């Protein structure tokens, strides 16, 4: 595993040619200090309010997408995976619609849009490593698997990760295999066992991020989240993911069926 094996960038009013070229070659890019500490705290507070509401009301799904519940280090019920967060949080919605996110659409062909109401919407993942946790790590996968299961053409997409906590090897951390976003369909389907394979890859790169950093990856790239070697509160890792997509507009509603690929999410622990 390689650490600090890539440059980090500053996000300006528009992307530079150097930044676009780096993303095109590697399939990911890391921007430092995109969100302020105040913005991060506001977003975290809003997710805690959402969590309290969903637990109180016993909500199981949002627009057909299951909510992943579990326990924290104090054995309290928590939400590990929040779907469609921006529909319930003004703070998240405002950040998602800010110019910082809008400018990233230039990494995709014309017609790219932020999918607040499509797929799983804006996701917040809350990892914590305790014996009772349902969300300690996530095995190798590509985000494009969803399109494959529905028999759709695999189109380029972005997953924009805003880090709400510091995240390095001590938290497990995101691992990506640079350049795999250009792989053929066979390798996308069969190179690794989706979610079940959590083994280290000799070509993987550790994403070492601070709270407020933003890491953008192509949906076709192989990536995983490793399990923290630490037990308890110090293992906490929260990341908000914003999808930017192409193709036909397909919004989700309360009547939407549960997508088939979510059966695989049961393998994620």
Which residue stretches match the model-derived regions?
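Short helix-to-loop capping/linker segments positioned immediately adjacent to catalytic or ligand/cofactor-binding
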Residues: 93, 112-114, 146-151, 161-164, ...
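Short, structured patches in soluble enzyme cores that scaffold and shape functional sites
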Residues: 142-144, 162-166, 178
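Non-heme Fe(II)-dependent double-stranded beta-helix
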Residues: 1-25, 32-140
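Double-stranded beta-helix
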Residues: 21, 154, 166-224, 249
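Glycine-rich nucleotide phosphate-binding loop and flanking beta-alpha elements
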Residues: 37, 146, 223
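Non-heme Fe(II)/2-oxoglutarate
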Residues: 1-9, 59, 187-194, 214-216, ...
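Extracellular structured ligand-interaction cores
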Residues: 28, 137, 155-159, 171, ...
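Acidic, His- and aromatic-enriched active-site or binding-groove loops in soluble protein domains
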Residues: 136-154
